[in-house]
UniProtKB/Swiss-Prot annotation:
Function: Acts in the modification of cell walls via demethylesterification of cell wall pectin.
Xref: InterPro entries: Invertase/methylesterase_inhib, Pectin_lyas_fold, Pectin_lyase_fold/virulence, Pectinesterase_Asp_AS, Pectinesterase_cat, Pectinesterase_inhib_dom
Catalysed reaction, written as an equation: [(1->4)-alpha-D-galacturonosyl methyl ester](n) + n H2O = [(1->4)-alpha-D-galacturonosyl](n) + n methanol + n H(+)
One Pfam family hit: Pectinesterase
Magnesium among keywords: no
Name of protein: Probable pectinesterase/pectinesterase inhibitor 13
Gene that encodes it: PME13
Record-linked CDD domains: PMEI-like_3 (cd15798)
Length: 614
């Protein structure tokens, strides 16, 4: 072994020590807050006492370390340093009602903010609120304060966007789109605040998946707002405002992660992906619906048929007739036929199920495209926004062809959405898995460039993914995941799927290089595991974004236990962000932990919560 290898090992050892030290300090800080909260009673007093002993040991270690002449600063990035982690008060709590000592609030803020990417802004945000009388009584009040700052900043973004003046129609469209997206973002932050307001500290971990999903969506909405503007003065004006709210959102997500990691050992909360209770949003009707084979057994609320044999002849007419308030799941049965219409299931239409006669029998089709000067975001044939949307045995198409360039068949931003035995056909940008938690089972997805893209937390399980023939000279990419921040809980997981050439590509596949994906945004995250990858995929596996080094250090691309002629990872890219993972790491991206998949299994949909080789 070379001498420089010993140096690298020592650097890693030192870095691990620093990380462990900081984690212990944060654990102690959060434990102290929990005790002060007066919610958890005497059990937490004992835990805090144990933490106090651990903190005293760490404090003594820190003193000894400083005497030796080296500091205990933690380096987060090459150009960004955090101050030495402060040590919370060592005095054990005498009672649960005890208040925090003067000056201790600042130390706690510093400690909690040390886990964020934008530490100084985090400290300033929380400090400003404590100065205004913000109560330092439990961990969730810190988080609430951080999210309130996001919500207030979004008001400023909206104010800025509405003040913009232009005569250019493209810019006007971008302004209108951004306005709607900022309003969507505000809805998510308000929902997050409402959730925190009704949650006790000892139940906090149960609501974390919702908070992470909603705030991750806020990040996506902010980014899409910016993407809508062409480069120029107008975009620069908006970018300054939007970037500010993105920073605050990132800090909120980081604080959630900090509290989750450090409340778990304190409170022994049940693992969120192994809940014993069936979630309240899943009804018995949902389970019967997804288990049903005969559509007549569904007892739909409305039937759509082009031949007039149903209640409506168009899907949109059926949606307009759906009651504004409906208890339980509302089912629309769409009979065989090609429905040439643009459909939006808006946010008010929650818990809606659409069932067709088959993915190649009941088809919703359109042909909007970027080539027709339509924004990619608005080209979707079908849009699913309402929470809890389910589709079974349906087909979704965009027939713009390869000449249409970006042309979306479906855009999904419905939280806890399920697609079972569905088919998605297009070329570039076929399936826009935009935001929130999504599950696709036994589906067929067909396209050319970035044909599964977006910033959702989405798992594709037991699906057939077919790469088709595009324009001459084009390179095909299956995925283009758009995670913009390391604390977002989003990403794509392709699990036990088949990736192969479509029939039209097979004879000429040597003329079209195809790849598993490319990084659309800085923290793009895609995992391909336990899948069959046929020889349509280039041995390097992954493609750079427009032949640059963009995101190759910050992305997370992983493969685990794949098979097929292109499943061999020997010749894969040598990027810092790509890795071949082991079983332990792969488990993190199964349905259970990644989507908190109890809601899927409770719905009656077939699902594999863990690995197939377990």
């Amino acid at each position: 072994m070379a001498f420089q290898d010993f140096d690298k090992i020592q650097e890693r050892v030192n870095a691990n020590r620093k990380r462990k030290f900081r984690k212990r300090i944060i654990v102690g800080t959060v434990s102290l807050l929990v005790v002060v909260a007066a919610i958890v009673g005497g059990a937490f007093a004992y835990v805090a006492y144990e933490k106090r002993n651990e903190q005293q040991q760490q404090q003594q270690q820190a003193k000894n370390h400083n005497k030796s002449g080296s500091g205990n600063n933690v380096v987060k990035d090459s150009d960004k340093k955090s101050p030495s982690p402060p040590t919370p008060s060592q005095k054990a709590p005498v009672s649960a009602a005890q208040s925090v000592k003067p000056g201790q609030g600042d130390k706690i803020i510093q400690t909690l903010c040390s886990s964020t990417l934008y530490m100084q802004i985090c400290e300033k945000t929380l400090k400003n609120r404590t100065d205004k009388g913000f109560a330092l009584d439990n961990p969730t009040t810190f988080l609430k304060s951080a999210i309130e700052a996001v919500n207030e900043d979004l008001d400023l973004v909206l104010e800025k966007v509405l003040s913009l003046k232009t005569e250019n129609q493209d810019d006007k469209d971008a302004i209108e789109q951004c306005k709607l997206l900022v309003e969507d973002a505000k809805e998510e932050t308000v929902a997050s605040l409402n959730k925190i307001n009704v949650t006790e500290v000892n139940s906090f971990e149960k609501v974390v998946p919702d908070l992470e999903s909603w705030l991750s969506a806020v990040m996506s909405y902010q980014e899409t707002c910016l993407d809508g503007f062409e480069e120029g003065n107008l975009k620069s004006e908006v970018k300054t405002s939007v970037n500010s709210s993105q920073v605050l959102t990132s800090n909120s997500l980081a604080l959630i992660k900090t509290f989750t990691e450090n409340l778990s050992p304190v409170m022994k909360v049940v693992e969120r992906h192994l809940l014993d209770d069936i979630p309240s949003w899943v009804s018995n009707d949902d389970r019967r619906m997804l288990r049903a084979v005969d559509v007549k057994a569904l007892k739909p609320n409305a039937t759509v048929a082009k031949d007039g044999s149903g209640d409506f002849t168009t899907i949109n007419d059926a949606l307009r007739a759906m009651p504004e308030k409906y208890e339980g799941r509302y089912i629309i049965y769409v009979k065989q036929g090609i429905y040439d219409e643009y459909v939006t299931v808006d946010k008010k239409k929650a818990n809606l199920t659409m069932v067709g006669d088959g993915s190649q029998k009941t088809i919703v089709t359109g042909n909007k495209s970027h080539a027709k000067k339509i924004r990619t975001f608005l080209t979707a044939t079908f849009v699913a926004q309402g929470e809890g949307f389910m589709a079974q045995s349906m087909g979704f198409r965009n027939t713009a062809g390869p000449e249409g360039h970006q042309a979306v068949a479906i855009r999904v931003q419905s939280d806890r959405s399920i697609f079972l035995n569905c088919r998605f056909e297009g070329y570039q940008d076929t399936l826009y898995a935009y935001t929130h938690r999504q599950y696709y089972r036994s589906c067929v997805i067909v396209g050319t460039i970035d044909f599964i893209f977006g910033d959702a937390a989405a798992i594709f399980q037991n699906c057939n993914i077919f790469i088709r023939k595009g324009l001459p000279g084009q390179k095909n990419t299956v995925t283009a995941q758009g995670r913009v921040d390391k604390f977002q809980t989003t990403g794509f997981v392709v699990h036990n799927c088949k990736i192969a050439a479509n029939e039209d590509l097979k004879p000429v596949k040597e003329e079209y290089k195809s790849y598993l994906g490319r990084p659309w945004k800085n923290y793009s995250r895609t995992i391909i595991m336990e899948s069959k990858i046929e020889n349509v995929i280039d041995p390097v596996g992954w493609l750079r974004w427009q032949e640059t080094d963009f995101a190759i250090d910050t992305l997370y691309y992983a493969e685990y236990n794949n098979k097929g002629s292109s499943g061999d990872t020997t010749s894969r890219v040598k990027w810092p962000g790509f890795k071949v993972i082991n079983k332990e790491e792969a488990l993190n991206y199964t349905v259970g932990p990644f989507l908190q998949g109890d809601w899927i299994s409770a719905s009656g949909s077939p699902v594999k919560l863990g690995l197939y080789d377990a």
